[in-house]
Amino acid sequence: MRGYLITFEGPDGAGKTTVINEIIKQLPQSLQERTLVTREPGGSKISENIRTIILDPENKEMDDRTEALLYAAQRSQHVSEVIRPALATGKVVLSDRFIDSSLAYQGVGRNLGIEEVKQINDFGTGGLEPDLTIFLDLDPAVGLARIEKERAGQEDRLEQEKIDFHNKVYAGYRELFERYPDRIKKVDANLPIKDVAANSVKIIRKQLPDIFM
């Protein structure tokens, strides 16, 4: 039984974590038992430590290239320590963010270039790509308003960026959606969470039917 990597992407406040938790509830019990949920930045002890550095609001002087390299570093560790071993045992891995986040946030948002950022990430992950990516499509302003309502004053370093940055990131996601239409599928994240999750499960069933066998 082969493993599958399904990633969830979208702007800050799109509800990725909540949607993934709801998706788990909607999966058959047998599939729930072979599913591993993880996140980025993070997912392993070392990667979580790097996450703290990346997102700490105190690190305002962080250079854009440093940021991109730290994301690639935590991803390299995450893949080698968590994702590849899980895939090797036939797990279905659901990851809250993966390489597309770097391509959108650092490649486009930080103007470092999609291809340049992809190159350092491919080096770190050995070229591992998701079998399917769910893009939770939401206007960045709506997402940031959600964050402010839920945890005002506790935003991380990237969430604190100006709206112009978040709009560029969103444009980056749209570009990736158009560039990789076979892998990246869009879901309207304005809908209620249960509907967003149900629509995501429909896409998974259609794109990766073998998972449910």
From Swiss-Prot:
Official protein name in the record: Thymidylate kinase
Catalytic activity: dTMP + ATP = dTDP + ADP
InterPro entries per record: P-loop_NTPase, Thymidylate_kin-like_dom, Thymidylate_kin_CS, Thymidylate_kinase
Gene name, Swiss-Prot/TrEMBL: tmk
EC number, as in UniProt: 2.7.4.9
Key word Nucleotide-binding present: yes
Pfam families named in the record: Thymidylate_kin
Annotated GO biological process: dTDP biosynthetic process; dTTP biosynthetic process; dUDP biosynthetic process
Residues involved in ATP binding: 10-17
Similarity annotation: Belongs to the thymidylate kinase family.
Function description: Phosphorylation of dTMP to form dTDP in both de novo and salvage pathways of dTTP synthesis.
A single GO molecular function term of this UniProt record: dTMP kinase activity
Organism in which the protein naturally occurs: Lactobacillus johnsonii (strain CNCM I-12250 / La1 / NCC 533)
GO CC term (a single one): cytosol
Keywords, alphabetical: ATP-binding, Kinase, Nucleotide biosynthesis, Nucleotide-binding, Transferase
